[in-house]
Amino acid sequence: MSEHYYSEKPSVKSNKQTWSFRLRNKDFTFTSDSGVFSKKEVDFGSRLLIDSFEEPEVEGGILDVGCGYGPIGLSLASDFKDRTIHMIDVNERAVELSNENAEQNGITNVKIYQSDLFSNVDSAQTFASILTNPPIRAGKKVVHAIFEKSAEHLKASGELWIVIQKKQGAPSAIEKLEELFDEVSVVQKKKGYYIIKAKKV
């Protein structure tokens, strides 16, 4: 089987790189590595999701599903210091990098842990917002499972924020979300990427 960034234990040889990137008007230092998604820069889709995200009206934590080396969760943790940001990824190397990046950016209001989808998320835990740049290459079944589990783990009036390219299935993603959520809207479109917000009322 060929290896992907959504593999649990990447076997590709480690080749760490450290670089700086500006997100939400703040400078961050990230260390990335082989075997994680978009290792040389914060990818356009994640940047668009980070820039588009608005703090939820409801109180509570925020969950970053498929956190990679951490740009989404850490940039939001830096902005919303009174909230705890949970960051999960199936990829053990990604989880290690996220922890390293939290430390080198002085971010403490995070809980970062390995989880295959929501397998290690407390079944009773609910969040004010969940964000994901879903692993499209893992297949529609996995992406839809993220949507389904997100619906279960959101508070009342909580929101799921997603970035997905039109060519990678944004229209079918919207259809699936409309089955699960009360309000679904496209809040941003840019260069073929959609930012979709799905809300539980």
UniProtKB/Swiss-Prot annotation:
CDD domains: AdoMet_MTases (cd02440). The keyword Transport does not apply. GO terms for molecular function: rRNA (guanine-N2-)-methyltransferase activity. Keywords: Methyltransferase, Transferase. It holds the Pfam family MTS. It comes from the Bacteria. This is Uncharacterized protein YbxB. GO terms for biological process: rRNA base methylation. Belongs to the methyltransferase superfamily.
